[in-house]
């Protein structure tokens, strides 16, 4: 069972954030109903289709295995449908053959060669501040209002929210609030299975601050098997690389506590972005280093070289390199 004290704190947080100013907000909502209704009546549903295709060719060098080249792909098709202009029904179809790839890059897909739905969710607004999300298939981080990093963690091997937003792929429902001063808060119930029960359910809560050049979040993730807590922050100075840092702790039901941390820099240049980072990449707290560059060849075509080093269980190092091409359509 999730610790009662922690759950009560999470519920108290939820009530404070979302209902404290409910009375003050109700009048503003009522005043907008008539004008919004008129706009919705004139709005015709629209659907936009976008896609991305990654080719990844790379190799991994380690002392315990022979070197070889690996060539994989990831294909995603995104359908965004809006019924009244302030909502979005997102459907993502995905395929990819990187299940056996030793590179284990975030931009690789392990879904298999058959096109499958990987995300299906509906997002809608109550007013200018409140937003809700619901769907049968989504990731734990989707629907959270806060911005935790200025670094692109969707390319290589490091991720600063491995535990605090990890709920697998499954159903979820959440509500979030964004204020004009940058403060935000989110509460989400998610599951890693279509059968939602005490074993699979996750309670994810987050508070944060997002400004143009700095921000951060505090996030918790409560589950029967673990409780995770994390803090993340970023700063984007002018004419210098952005700095992002995060640390999170995962308390297992076995009594073991593991941590995950990332320190990263990212810089935008004339036609490219460059990023470097160091941090832990697995539950054994092994250290990894990564560097990448995203080079814009055209609006629809990018080349992304990736280089990484990671410690393994034999106290040696794995050296990896890949050339990735991204096509947008």
Explain the meaning of each model-derived region.
Residues 180-185, 198-288:
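Detector for outer-membrane/organellar transmembrane beta-barrel domains
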Residues 103, 144-148:
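Outer-membrane beta-barrel and related beta-rich outer-membrane complex signature
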Residues 2-24:
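Classical Sec-dependent N-terminal signal peptides that target proteins to the secretory pathway
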Residues 94-96, 139-145:
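Short, solvent-exposed beta-strand-terminating loops
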Residues 136:
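Residues on the solvent-exposed faces and adjacent turns
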Residues 192-194:
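Active-site-adjacent "lid" and substrate-binding segments of diverse enzymatic cores
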Residues 148-156:
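A short alpha->loop->secondary-structure connector
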Residues 22-132, 159-189, 199, 208-210, ...:
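Beta-barrel outer-membrane channel/assembly domains of diderm bacteria
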């Amino acid at each position: 069972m999730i610790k009662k004290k922690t759950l009560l704190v999470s519920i108290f947080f939820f009530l404070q954030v979302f209902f404290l100013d409910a009375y003050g907000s109700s009048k503003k909502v009522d005043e907008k109903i008539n004008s919004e209704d008129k706009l919705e009546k004139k709005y015709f549903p629209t659907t936009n289709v976008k896609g991305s295709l990654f080719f990844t060719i790379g190799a991994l060098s380690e002392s315990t295995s022979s070197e070889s080249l690996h060539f994989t792909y990831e294909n995603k098709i995104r359908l965004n449908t809006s019924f009244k202009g302030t909502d979005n029904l997102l459907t993502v179809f995905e395929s990819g053959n990187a299940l056996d790839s030793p590179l284990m890059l975030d931009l690789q897909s392990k879904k298999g060669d058959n096109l499958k739905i990987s995300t299906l969710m509906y997002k809608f607004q109550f007013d200018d501040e409140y937003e809700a999300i619901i769907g049968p298939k989504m990731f734990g981080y989707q629907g959270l209002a806060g911005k935790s990093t200025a670094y692109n963690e969707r390319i290589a091997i490091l991720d600063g929210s491995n535990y605090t937003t990890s709920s697998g792929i499954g159903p979820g429902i959440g509500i979030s609030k964004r204020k004009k001063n940058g403060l935000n808060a989110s509460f989400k119930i998610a599951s890693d299975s279509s059968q939602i029960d005490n074993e699979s359910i996750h309670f994810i809560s987050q508070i944060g601050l997002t400004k143009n050049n700095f921000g951060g979040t505090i996030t918790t993730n409560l589950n029967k098997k673990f409780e995770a807590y994390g803090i993340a922050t970023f700063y984007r100075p002018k004419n210098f690389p952005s700095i992002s840092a995060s640390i999170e702790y995962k308390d297992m039901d076995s009594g073991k506590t593991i941590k995950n941390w990332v320190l990263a820099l990212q810089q935008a240049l004339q036609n490219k972005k460059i990023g470097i980072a160091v941090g832990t990449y697995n539950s054994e707290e092994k250290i990894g280093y990564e560097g990448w560059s995203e080079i814009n060849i055209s609006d629809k075509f990018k080349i992304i070289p990736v280089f990484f080093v990671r410690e393994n269980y034999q106290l040696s190092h794995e050296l990896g390199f890949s050339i990735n091409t991204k096509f947008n359509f």
